[in-house]
Amino acid sequence: MASCPDSDNSWVLAGSESLPVETLGPASRMDPESERALQAPHSPSKTDGKELAGTMDGEGTLFQTESPQSGSILTEETEVKGTLEGDVCGVEPPGPGDTVVQGDLQETTVVTGLGPDTQDLEGQSPPQSLPSTPKAAWIREEGRCSSSDDDTDVDMEGLRRRRGREAGPPQPMVPLAVENQAGGEGAGGELGISLNMCLLGALVLLGLGVLLFSGGLSESETGPMEEVERQVLPDPEVLEAVGDRQDGLREQLQAPVPPDSVPSLQNMGLLLDKLAKENQDIRLLQAQLQAQKEELQSLMHQPKGLEEENAQLRGALQQGEAFQRALESELQQLRARLQGLEADCVRGPDGVCLSGGRGPQGDKAIREQGPREQEPELSFLKQKEQLEAEAQALRQELERQRRLLGSVQQDLERSLQDASRGDPAHAGLAELGHRLAQKLQGLENWGQDPGVSANASKAWHQKSHFQNSREWSGKEKWWDGQRDRKAEHWKHKKEESGRERKKNWGGQEDREPAGRWKEGRPRVEESGSKKEGKRQGPKEPPRKSGSFHSSGEKQKQPRWREGTKDSHDPLPSWAELLRPKYRAPQGCSGVDECARQEGLTFFGTELAPVRQQELASLLRTYLARLPWAGQLTKELPLSPAFFGEDGIFRHDRLRFRDFVDALEDSLEEVAVQQTGDDDEVDDFEDFIFSHFFGDKALKKRSGKKDKHSQSPRAAGPREGHSHSHHHHHRG
């Protein structure tokens, strides 16, 4: 079996290439003309001539050319029809009848011999097939496929065999035109190789220049540069093919260049755009890092300011601590003096201090004060210290009396609560009333005690408000300016006001203690101590009967009942009517929350904080209908005790419902005094609540007065109150 044409031994026509050849068969049989024809292409002058390329196509057609030097046109062309099956070609040797003669061999030699002026017919005219002969067919099969090693000794003349490479990769099929040009232009191939390398080098230099110009090589990151080198440099397989095979490089020169082998201008543009974008991102990152660095530096400088602020805060804290220590020391002194006063106090059987032992001390202070006024050589500083000590002692006494009255009031409230639950507490109420009456009597006796001068009594009333304002403000310098300007004036006023108080109290000795306290209070308020009158509010004496009502809302009524004895008494102000203190709301904090809780608890709807202007307008509208309420319209109960600086009612200190109830009770007192009946102001609460809560409040409170009239606890005080008023009018 013969091997395929891809084997190492392939039959080709001799060309101008200097390849190792060997002659098959005896060389003496060749004609001289044939030998000259074979040697003619090797002449230097005919090297660049055209040569005949005889190739075998897929159908086994042999192209032949004519030699102009032979002088005759060879009309005999051979055509071999071979059978190709896959990669195996079967060649049958010629039979016994097919003999090869010397003439035929010479003719074949002439056909294969190429003259110097042989024209290349490739690409000019299609190959023509000629009648075939058994001899030509055998020669064609010998050129198509190589036989075994035994066939190499076939006696053939004029044919040469080129030795193939023993160990090498399969060579690609080279086009005919490339093979012909490579055979005739060896130097041109080398020039093409150098030109291709120059083009590649120029592209590389161009890319590097662009990168240098754009600043890409100056960046610290090497990722984009490695990608550029991978894309700009040619494929290493192409370089290996150029160095290894010359035929492969010729094929690359003739064949169209693939777009992936060398980077195109479009790819370079995209790459440059990508690099520019990356450079822009890097610049943005650098700007962000710079901003963060500046911010960090600013944060590092901030602790200096914080340290200064901390130092200021420490200084303020130290000052506050020093002030607190001073206040604590002053408090210790006050406690020591208070203990001394309590030791001098003469207590009754029930433990209440009936009269203070301040008579000798007061006389001593007055006796010391007289010589001071007579001795001008004493400095003003000593006078100031003496006044401060005297005022401090008076303030301590007032504070002690206030604590005692507060405890009595708490006991009274607890007893009233027990009475409201149905417990038998009438005896306890009578006892508390008796204790309260004794306490008030003791206060009055303390002001009228022979051992205590009227000046000390007046000073007790005049200095209480003055000292309390100092206690809450905590400003020591305020005393200096006030005392310097009013020291002498205060001394002269003491004697005059003391004589006036003696006159007032002396003319009323035949009346009960409650009446004397009632008559003496307006004159104190006229002297400018309005807050002192408010503090004296809870110190109310019992009625003549010596018993208190069980209702907590009527504690303020004894003043009005005593005042109705004299029909010529002026109308009391709203401040006198609203003097009783009610319990603060529980379970809430803040004005808004307490107002909302009160509305939901008692009326089933939320209550917005009441404004001072709105309530004043409602009161004026209601009082305008009452002909006898002109004085009340001028003095509305809108004091800071019930409304804040922003004009909002203090729901967190007092329920608005209790406030309205107190207003209604005050109006009822005035109505009874003026008209003898309180039915005219029964709709006051409905008028106020309907404005703030709407019709729902009226429906919920529609049966309130009926229930109160049926309840013994609620009806008792009101009925007793009405009877007492009628009794007073009759008297």
From Swiss-Prot:
Expressed in early hematopoietic precursors. Residues 1-10, 62-75, 121-132 have a biased composition (Polar residues). A motif (Nuclear localization signal) lies at residues 485-505, 695-720. Residues 364-375, 472-499, 508-543, 551-569 have a biased composition (Basic and acidic residues). The modification Phosphothreonine is found at residue 152. Interacts with TEX11. Interacts with ESR1, PBX1, PBX2 and PBX3. The C-terminal domain (AA 443-731) contains a nuclear export signal. Association to the cytoskeleton through a N-terminal leucine rich-domain (AA 190-218). Regulator of pre-B-cell leukemia transcription factors (BPXs) function. Inhibits the binding of PBX1-HOX complex to DNA and blocks the transcriptional activity of E2A-PBX1. Tethers estrogen receptor-alpha (ESR1) to microtubules and allows them to influence estrogen receptors-alpha signaling. This is Pre-B-cell leukemia transcription factor-interacting protein 1. It comes from Homo sapiens. The gene is PBXIP1.
